[in-house]
Amino acid sequence: MSRRRFAERGSEDSRDGSDRLLREAGERLGGSPPRLRRSGVFVRVLRDARPYAPQIGALTLLSLLATPLALLLPVPLKIAVDSVIGSHPPPGILDAVLPAAATNSDTGLLITVALMFVAFAFLSQLVELATLVLGTHTGERLLILFRCRLFLHVQRLSLAYHDRRDIGESAYRIQWDASNLRDLAEAVFPLLAGLSMFIGILIVTVLINWQLALVALTVGPFVIVVARIYGRRLRSEWHTAERFESRGLSVVQETLSAMRVVTAFGQERREASRFVDRAWAGSHARRRLASVQGMLALLIGLITAIGTAAVLIVGVTQVNSSAITLGELLIVMAYLTLLYQPLEDMGKKVADLQEALAGIERAYSVLDEVPEVQQRRNARPLRRATGEIGFRAVSFAYRQQAPVLDDVWLRVEPGSFVGLVGATGAGKTTLVSLLTRFYDPTGGQIRLDGEDLRNYKIADLRSQFAIVLQEPVLFSTSIAENIAYGRPRADPDAIVEAARAANAHDFIAGLPDGYDTQVGDRGMLLSGGERQRVSLARAFLRDAPILIMDEPTSAVDVATERAIIEAVGRLAEGRTTLLITHRPSVQLRCERILRVDGGRVVDGGRPRAHQSPMPRIRERDMFPGAEPRSRR
């Protein structure tokens, strides 16, 4: 048997980093479900970004530092035109800080202004590099923390939420919508830098020539109005496009997870057509979005071009009248380019911002979902239950549908082996789903060890159960890690012992990689019987006081069924066991049979007698001394 890898759990550094991140994400979620929040997206993002306030502060300073550097870049051009080409004296500050040789001759002055330009450009690029590195680091940390919060929260949501949602939609919101948090940062800081640049250049331009500054400013209100009008349309279009894309992803995931069925029925073209329909709808939404973006960029570009032309006309007129020098006009035109550049970029930045806001709103809508199954504030811990189960007048219906269970009274003694039988859809699986608090009953009370389930902490309650499903659920990892899924830190010897108890060790040891064997997606590299025995081994290792099995032998051959039944017998020893099955051979292993029929539970007695007429379980039989509930 190979133990080369299955005892490993990844590198310590990686695991420690993941643990820290999960703890931080869990702390941000808090111990209770989040309440619906109505604060603005920006406010929520800022609140979530508080752990990275120092980095965000540094990014803000870098954005502000870019403004004076940008203002200095055109200065060498003005000096060269006015003092090297023209006859105007160089600025006095140069004489104060530079040796006379650098300013007394045209050659020295030209070399000086050239070096100034290189120095200013280098510093500007250095600030841009620092902004890129720090921004990427901060954005990625924010993103992975936000994704962890989303993923943890989605797993905490009740099964009723997942019953109503496509897997693809949830995956899209975690993987893609969440990434808009990073995109928002990438859009906000350039806008902040652009605003700082706009103010700085405006001040300098006013100092040079207030008339030209006034002419340049006339386009501002038009740009703001256009950006606001198209900004609302852009966010709406982004919501539409992302909705269609998530639907397309749902089709892909659904089809790939059911490839055997799709291939067996020859429905590849049908599924491709279904995907194309959704992809085409998404493509159409993207084309509409591109049209809106293009129109916004066109209008802003036209407005700034008109502003530039107006400044040029007024500026040339003033040069001809000797009101300003040619160098002053050139520096104003250079500043005007810098002034209008943020406005011209606004089309793209506004589009990026609206895309980010639309995605973040969708992601936050998931965080705003409140689990239907909630933990009470004063919930008590539960170490290990004895396994006594009681249902008192329990009713349940799925979201306004007809009741699946109605007035169920049931008592299971600790350590007993009970079989649940009944027609398909009678409510057997619903019964055990209520016991594990995947759902809460719409009426009545379920008790464990004499205490209402809702009085226990949810995590402690669910740790009392080991579950073996009709269709075994394995993860795309090694056999050992699948067996240890309920006890991730189990030692290798315990894993092997659990496999032996489940009659799985022999086939595992016969595999080339033994317990290190990768099982593939959903365990499809193993046979159905092998998957079921690995699932049983997982239940053995879990060592929970209550065992729930849902048709564990429904899809295996006779020999495999015999091996599984033997393992089930060992697994049930000393545990309260609920076994859902239709097979008489499996029912014979049970101490008692309960039939679920018409939303009620009837007692079938011993296994061999369960086919005879069965009386409905009465509450006074199950709970001596209980008063019958009044009937209407």
Predicted regions mapped to residue ranges:
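An intracellular "coupling" helix at the cytosolic face of ABC transporter transmembrane type-1 domains
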Residues: 50-54, 159-160, 176-184, 188, ...
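Hydrophobic alpha-helical segments in the permease module
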Residues: 117-124, 128, 220-227, 293-307, ...
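ABC-type nucleotide-binding domain
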Residues: 375-376, 382-632
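Transmembrane helices of ABC transporter permease
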Residues: 55-68, 189-240, 311-324, 341
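Conserved catalytic Walker-motif region of ABC-type ATPase nucleotide-binding domains
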Residues: 154, 275, 363, 391-393
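Juxtamembrane helix-loop junctions of ABC transporter transmembrane domains
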Residues: 30-38, 61-62, 69-86, 116, ...
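Cytosolic ends of transmembrane helices, especially the final helix of ABC transmembrane type-1 domains
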Residues: 244, 267, 291, 338-366
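Membrane-integrated ABC transporters
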Residues: 1-73, 85-117, 123, 127-135, ...
